[in-house]
Amino acid sequence: MPKLLLDEHLSPNLAEALMKRGVDAIAVAGSPLATLLDEELFAKAADLGRIIVTFNNPDFVAEITAFAAANPNRQVPGVIFIPGKKIRASEISRLAAVIEEVARRIDRGEADPRYGLWVDLG
């Protein structure tokens, strides 16, 4: 199962819900990683071998592409984008289930996060 790194805008409660489902997830929010710039976060994700989970931010795609071009030997394992800008507490369990399924698809080789995977909560 792939390891996940939840971007600073995602609640540590989501990481906890994922861990309860057997998905290795750590949250940037509330940790020393919260002070990192995006480029530093990409480097940390690459070093830790973790897929970044973040909101669907158009700038993020350009930034991670630039990081990959500038660091050909230090690639981020991938990105999972979730829709919206905020997750309500009542949505955490459902979102964790969807992300767990995406992680299982990655694990089975059915999805490739290197180019970004977009989660559908519909």
Regions found by a protein language model. Give the residues of each.
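Conserved BB-loop
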Residues: 24-36
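Acidic, metal-binding active-site segment of PIN/NYN-like and related structure-specific nucleases
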Residues: 38, 46-64
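Short hydrophobic/aromatic segments of transmembrane alpha-helices and their interfaces
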Residues: 25, 42-43
